């Protein structure tokens, strides 16, 4: 989730955008409960698709990206659950269900409730159905990892090795697999998708044009959704620009409920208030 910002001028009255990185950014103090949707908040934004006759009123949509952040967080948590080999097969299978996707409605392993920091969603399908990390991983060869593997293959290999360790750490190599899996996924999935897909070829005028819906029946235009998808991979809460750097950090660590709870309902909505 991200911590860099590049100035841009784009649709939703948002004045700056993070460069798809790694750390999570978030939300603002009690005053924001009443002024949560200011000019520095990412949405809501009205539907502008010509001829749209559905019931949707907000064109902002990036729930698939939020689901993948949750898959990443849950996978990182699972990577530390090995007992030294005894549970390796079961743990690997469970980790692969979060990496490769599952037909089951998987529980959110992280983030979860922490003190008065109450998370609204408890299962992945409450955010978005049918999402995975494997299908969005970098498809080229990763030269910096042995074996000439693709991004998805590297992550699958890391998962296999993590499952065989005790607590995710391999004392022979010094590899900390929760950290390796997390940091590699941030680059091979989130950064790669945002920078080398949505903010690259999909910004071409003839690719997902803004004069048409993103796909048939969609309530957002091509370029609206391209930008939303990139923002979603950045991993910031919708009102993160209203926060100081300290508040962003505190929310990422689940230590500042007031800053996180933009609408003041006492719950943290992973779709907009935290990722």
Which sequence ranges carry the predicted segments?
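Bacterial N-terminal signal peptides
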Residues: 20-29
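General helical secondary-structure elements
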Residues: 7-8, 64
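Sec/Tat signal peptide C-region and signal peptidase I cleavage site
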Residues: 30-36
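N-terminal targeting leader peptides, primarily classical Sec-type signal peptides for secretion
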Residues: 1-4
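Bacterial N-terminal signal peptides that target proteins for export
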Residues: 9-21
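Mature extracytoplasmic or organellar-lumen-exposed domains after removal of signal/transit peptides
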Residues: 36-275
């Amino acid at each position: 989730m991200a911590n860099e910002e590049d100035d841009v001028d784009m649709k939703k009255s948002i004045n700056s955008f993070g460069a798809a990185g790694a750390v999570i950014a978030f939300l603002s103090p009690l005053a924001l409960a009443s002024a949560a949707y200011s000019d520095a908040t990412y949405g809501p934004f009205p539907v502008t698709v010509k001829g749209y006759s559905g019931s949707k009123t907000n064109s902002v949509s990036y729930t698939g990206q939020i689901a993948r952040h949750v898959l990443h967080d849950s996978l990182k948590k699972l990577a530390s659950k090995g007992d030294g080999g005894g549970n390796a097969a079961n743990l690997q299978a469970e980790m692969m269900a979060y990496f490769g996707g599952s037909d089951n409605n998987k529980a959110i392993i992280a983030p979860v409730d922490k003190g008065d920091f109450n998370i609204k969603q408890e299962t992945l399908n409450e955010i978005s159905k049918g999402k995975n990390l494997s299908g969005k991983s970098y498809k080229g060869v990763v030269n910096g990892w042995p074996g000439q593997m693709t991004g998805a293959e590297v992550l699958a290999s890391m998962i296999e090795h993590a499952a065989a360790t005790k607590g995710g750490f391999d004392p022979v190599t010094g590899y900390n697999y929760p950290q390796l899996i997390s940091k590699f996924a941030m680059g091979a999935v989130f950064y790669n998708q945002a920078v080398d897909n949505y903010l690259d070829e999909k910004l071409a005028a003839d690719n997902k044009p803004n004069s048409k819906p993103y796909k048939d029946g969609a309530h957002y235009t091509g370029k609206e959704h391209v930008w939303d998808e990139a923002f979603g991979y950045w991993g910031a809460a919708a009102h993160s620009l209203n926060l100081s750097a300290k508040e962003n950090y505190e929310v990422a660590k689940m230590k500042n409920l007031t800053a996180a709870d933009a609408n003041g309902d006492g719950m943290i909505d992973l779709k907009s208030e935290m990722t």
